[in-house]
């Protein structure tokens, strides 16, 4: 291995901001490794981690409130560059004797940052034509900066929006450079980690793959690994990465539950078994799933039936694989963060063991999670580097229960057939018209109600298909995608004419909230 891709790293201390994961993603986009840890990480752990720089996130609290989160005071004496964002800047200011007060006028949303004094190394290229658009989200502000600090930027409503103490490599911004609404924020974070902290940018897809291959080989040795292959992005990239590392020691189990997209099972087999030489066991279990789901209309019970039966079948197949001692999962970094947060209210060490995927204890298999350090966009980049087809790597999210939660009410084989054909037409047209990559998630929904229609000289009484397409950054909130009327009409016409049993198509224009993205 040519270099240690974890040798240069940034520590992000989380004070509860909704944007903290975005900070980490921006640092990774600068090709620098970073980790999220809780704000109260102790000093010995920080020293052991060995960061080249520290970022203090924003947060919902006020620094002058009783019980407000703080860092260990000696953190600022470590000689490591620190960037405080929003709450992080206020915390640093207060620590050094500055004054933080409630803002006379709160700032939420777009603002214009104006330069004050010398910009210094971090802000040298941040201002263009004497200003820089930024995104604010704060109710407090720094009224008086500490000794040794100078003000670099201000706004109409806040006299102190950016500060620096160049001698001690301490910097603070009241705005959020990590969000898209701060156009030059990505550049500012890149400048901090590359120029201020001195990172050289070793965290690249090629280096990540090389490092992962070495680690997988060291972990697994000559033992066998089994992986539940779903056809989704995460399990597909995990399979390709592990296969590169250990070849035919990997055995994938692909369960076709009858609730997949059109020809998805064949596509998975072509990609992995035929083109890449991965050992894939295909289990055709459509009848078992349809029998188990018969008569069930409750969404949560459907999910449990599908999930439990998948585990049951996976265990049956795994028992037939001799000498398998490892179970591989496509766990990614946000899964680790959310799993830790649900248990403790804090993000935990990325290296700590979390059985995110719910491995049954009695299987007694060791867990292999080669993607657990990566965000979704990094997983996609690695998938492309490994040679996976672009449509597979960049396909929209697909729920674990598959079409089982896109068929409202009871699931029947004929309903699934209608839905997968309608969905395939919809997705095909989104690709053809150039909309697919602009949409975060798009899919068709089968409504188990019949409507009256007219075809030829006769009346019809057939099913309804709903089309859904949303735009979102984080899937926590989402807006409906404004598909042009002409494209809607063409898609509707194709579905009605080509899918037997459908005579009406509707378009879902609900946002999240109040609606969810999926219908069930």
From Swiss-Prot:
- Indicate the segments forming the Glutamine amidotransferase type-1 domain, all copies: 9-202
Keywords for this protein: ATP-binding, Glutamine amidotransferase, GMP biosynthesis, Ligase, Nucleotide-binding, Purine biosynthesis
Q: Which reaction does it catalyse?
A: XMP + L-glutamine + ATP + H2O = GMP + L-glutamate + AMP + diphosphate + 2 H(+)
Alphabetical GO CC annotations of the entry are: cytosol
Q: Which InterPro entries match?
A: Class_I_gatase-like, GATASE, GMP_synth_C, GMP_synth_GATase, GMP_synthase, GMPS_ATP_PPase_dom, NAD/GMP_synthase, Rossmann-like_a/b/a_fold
Domain annotation GMPS ATP-PPase: ranges: 203-395
Q: What does this protein do?
A: Catalyzes the synthesis of GMP from XMP.
> How does it associate, per the subunit comment?
Homodimer.
Q: Which PANTHER family match?
A: GMP SYNTHASE [GLUTAMINE-HYDROLYZING], GMP SYNTHASE-RELATED
The family database entries (NCBIfam families) matched by this protein are listed as:
guaA_Cterm, guaA_Nterm, PRK00074.1
Task: Write the protein's name.
Answer: GMP synthase [glutamine-hydrolyzing]
């Amino acid at each position: 291995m040519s270099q240690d891709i974890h040798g240069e790293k940034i520590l992000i201390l989380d004070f509860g901001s909704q944007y903290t994961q975005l900070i980490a993603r921006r640092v990774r986009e600068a090709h620098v490794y970073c980790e999220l840890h809780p704000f109260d990480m102790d000093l010995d752990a920080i020293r052991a981690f060995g960061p080249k720089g520290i970022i203090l996130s924003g947060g919902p609290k006020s620094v002058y409130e009783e019980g407000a989160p703080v860092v260990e005071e000696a953190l600022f004496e470590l000689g490591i560059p620190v960037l405080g964002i929003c709450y992080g800047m206020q915390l640093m200011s207060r620590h050094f004797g500055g004054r933080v007060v409630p803002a006379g006028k709160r700032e939420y949303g777009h603002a214009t940052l104006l330069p004050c004094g010398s910009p210094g190394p971090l802000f040298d290229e941040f201002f263009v034509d004497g200003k820089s658009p930024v995104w604010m989200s704060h109710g407090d502000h720094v009224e008086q900066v500490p000794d040794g600090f100078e003000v670099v930027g201000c706004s109409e409503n806040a006299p102190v929006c950016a500060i620096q103490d160049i001698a001690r490599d301490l910097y603070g911004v009241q705005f959020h450079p990590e969000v898209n609404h701060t156009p030059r924020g990505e550049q500012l974070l890149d400048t901090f980690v590359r120029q201020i902290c001195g990172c050289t940018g070793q965290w690249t897809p090629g280096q990540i793959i090389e490092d992962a291959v070495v680690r997988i080989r060291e972990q697994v040795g000559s033992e066998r690994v089994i992986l539940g292959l779903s056809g989704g992005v995460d399990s597909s990239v995990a399979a390709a990465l592990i296969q590169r590392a250990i070849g035919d020691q990997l055995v994938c189990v692909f369960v076709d539950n009858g609730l997949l997209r059109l020809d998805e099972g064949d596509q998975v087999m072509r990609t992995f078994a035929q083109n890449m030489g991965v050992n894939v066991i295909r289990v055709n279990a459509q009848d078992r799933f349809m029998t188990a789901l018969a008569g069930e209309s409750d969404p949560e019970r459907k999910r449990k039936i599908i999930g439990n039966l998948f585990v049951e079948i996976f265990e049956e197949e795994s028992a037939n694989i001799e000498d398998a001692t490892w179970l591989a999962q496509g766990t990614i970094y946000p899964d680790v963060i959310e799993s830790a947060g649900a248990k403790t209210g804090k993000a935990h060490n990325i290296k700590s063991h979390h059985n995110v995927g719910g491995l049954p204890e009695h299987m007694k298999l060791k867990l292999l999670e080669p993607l657990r350090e990566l965000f979704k966009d990094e997983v996609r980049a690695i998938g492309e580097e490994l040679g996976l087809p672009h449509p597979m790597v960049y396909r929209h999210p697909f729920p674990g229960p598959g079409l089982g939660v896109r068929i409202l009410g009871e699931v029947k084989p004929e309903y699934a057939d209608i839905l997968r054909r309608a969905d395939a037409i919809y997705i095909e047209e989104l690709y053809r018209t150039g909309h697919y990559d602009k949409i975060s998630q798009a899919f068709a929904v089968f409504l188990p109600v019949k409507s009256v229609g007219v075809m030829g000289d006769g009346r019809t009484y057939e099913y309804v298909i709903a089309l859904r397409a949303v735009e979102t950054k984080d899937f926590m909130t989402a807006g409906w995608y404004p598909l042009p009327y002409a494209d809607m009409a063409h898609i509707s016409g194709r579905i009605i004419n080509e899918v037997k049993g459908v005579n009406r198509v509707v378009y879902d224009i609900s946002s999240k909230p109040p609606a969810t993205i999926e219908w069930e």
